[in-house]
Amino acid sequence: MTQRIGLLTLPLHSNYGGIIQIAALSAFVRALGLQPVLLRKEHQKAGWKRMVIEVLKRLPGQNIANYRNQYLKLQRHAAFMEAFLPEQSRVSRSPAELRMECDRLGLDAVVVGSDQVWRLDYIDDGAYDAYFLSFLVGSPIRRVSYAASFGTDRWPDASRVEDVSRLLAGFQAVSVREDSGQKLCADRFGRSDAVHVLDPTLLVDRSFHEEVIATLAPGRGESGLYAYVLDRSAAKKAIIDAAGQSENLSKITIAEPENDLAGYVDLGEWVRRFRDAEFVVTDSYHGMIFSIIFEKQFVAIGNAGRGLTRFKSLLAQLGLEDRLVEVGNERVQLPGAQIDYSRVNRRIAELRMKSRAFLSDALDVEARS
């Protein structure tokens, strides 16, 4: 009988990287001959608040607290989710509801990750411990983390260290996305065996992302310089302009602001823009990853507010530290040398082999008997 593997990540909203990374993880789990199931965890809120939010999502002519736009953006990913996401559970909001879903679905293991699932300010809704799989304490269901990220290089709440340490002690296998997370696991939570692995978007082959484009956005897109910048500023615009001049690219496409619903594209088009660009400037972690996947010359602008550690960790693994520029420096120096992707791809292949071996071994339920 095919083993059923629950996947727990942050709630699916309009974040491109958050959606495509769980699809990639699902694809790899399926390639192992296992059956992935997406565990739908939403933030805990009082019943009346949930009712108000549902009304705001569907009520045209307003965008109070951005609920309407977020809802409409997620609708644009319907075709992607239908094609690339696995079977989904019912929505759960508490650890108790998640436990009931795991039992109902007959899961053999639960994998938490990837993305910033262990970043406390992202998960502290009164049930942060769900992302440390508290709902599986006392259950025979196997507990694994894959490329879980703390988002920063420190844990902000000393009062919860003991609780998190106790929960992580019950995991059969722990892996994290950043080297700083590996250090946190060892120094703060007693898991010196935590493994540093690749983001799921790098775990799968490039062919997975080409399939996304072929399914949702076939054909060719814009060439030239593509700027995918989440947090805009005059300093970042200066970097974009400098990159355009340096690369002698007069054609510059700047992605629409995140709050611009009219210009919000589906995932197929989003991925295609990286594939078809000649040069990329981005302050997005997954924007940086897709620049690497499609072998683009790029500049990554440090995004401290959204988590700078993850940029530095991956770039260091690949020997691409010089591609990171940080706004605030008196003078930004753009990298001069071209990226040697034959070397980078060899390194990715090594890390991919290690990451695949970790997850394959972690999900080998037969090994428990």
Cite the ranges covered by each PLM segment:
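Active-site anion-handling motifs in enzyme catalytic cores
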Residues: 1-369
